[in-house]
Amino acid sequence: MRAELNQGLIDFLKASPTPFHATASLARRLEAAGYRRLDERDAWHTEAGGRYYVTRNDSSLIAIRLGRRSPLESGFRLVGAHTDSPCLRVKPNPEIARNGFLQLGVEVYGGALFAPWFDRDLSLAGRVTFRANGKLESRLVDFRKAIAVIPNLAIHLNRAANEGWPINAQNELPPIIAQLAPGEAADFRLLLDEQLLREHGITADVVLDYELSFYDTQSAAVIGLNDEFIAGARLDNLLSCHAGLEALLNAEGDENCILVCTDHEEVGSCSHCGADGPFLEQVLRRLLPEGDAFSRAIQRSLLVSADNAHGVHPNYADRHDANHGPALNGGPVIKINSNQRYATNSETAGFFRHLCQDSEVPVQSFVTRSDMGCGSTIGPITASQVGVRTVDIGLPTFAMHSIRELAGSHDLAHLVKVLGAFYASSELP
């Protein structure tokens, strides 16, 4: 069970270098399990016991498993996660020709750790919009092979490199993708033309625009002397997306279950497909009668907001409160912040702790040091947007926002088990 779940996560990470690809991967799994796609532009005809999913912007997804009881009686059991991760995104006019090399200008998306991006075998993926035969179309592309690198400057030329050398994103992060012959010009859009033909058999009249991100081609892996860890890119937060999907597809019971995987969390969630937009509320309203049905159903509902937590790093243990240091493989972490950076309260935390105990899953607590600031999640955003009671949780992780993060290999099974128990729970607090 644990090995199978971990391998499934590794496969999901490999297939999901961008939020667009992650959403497509989730949709494929749902369709294989009998879920039917709903188009927001059409009238919906849903029924008790139905299985559905909705996407928006190709980068956010809501999966719906309706029970036999009306949400007005039993509410919704919601699990929330996000599909995006910090990365380097290609600029609109990216070509940089310097000293015989072709580089691409990049914009930093989210709060990325810069240093780990150096000396990696990078590829490129995302969404391309183009015109073909006079028709406007979009397709996902993934170069898959390593096409770029950001080489470090040798220590001989930068003696202060190990003394906290600041990295300038504008000047030092553009990846090298090719050498140029003297006088040779480069057009990045021609490369995208070739990729569309190679990957989709489409000859584009013109590439109009794109949303493309570099990513590390090194596959995720189970590592450690005793296989204790999972190392890989985008664990924050595709790990939670994968856990939520596994729990949804395998949960027992007959409740109204929702999985929400939204884009743009790393940049504030303020978009038409992000948690700070209307996506979730609009979908839920379409599952309910008009009038006060939404307010009544949402007050019977609960959201588990799942986003990775900071595990105690042995080299930096003093960065944690001494009594609230989550351990890798120690189970899910309940995140608490009195200033509402997390939406957890005593009632929702107590309920989640109860689920863990009933499921024989270890559970931990996280509170940031009182002299340090605290990050946030989609939990408070969704709670304030929709009015749903929320508990913020996540699996402990090292190197969050690095190009390669680290989590415990036992924890995915822990999270899937307790989320399955949540989806199956007949009573909410």
Curated annotation (Swiss-Prot):
GO terms for biological process: proteolysis. InterPro entries: M18_aminopeptidase_2 (IPR022984), Peptidase_M18 (IPR001948), Peptidase_M18_dom2 (IPR023358). Pfam families: Peptidase_M18 (PF02127). One of its GO terms (cellular component) is cytoplasm. Its EC number is 3.4.11.-. Coiled coil: none annotated. Zn(2+) binds at H82, H156, H401. CDD domains: M18. Its cofactor is Zn(2+). One of its GO terms (molecular function) is zinc ion binding. Keywords: Aminopeptidase, Hydrolase, Metal-binding, Metalloprotease, Protease, Zinc. Belongs to the peptidase M18 family. This is Probable M18 family aminopeptidase 2. It comes from Pseudomonas paraeruginosa (strain DSM 24068 / PA7).
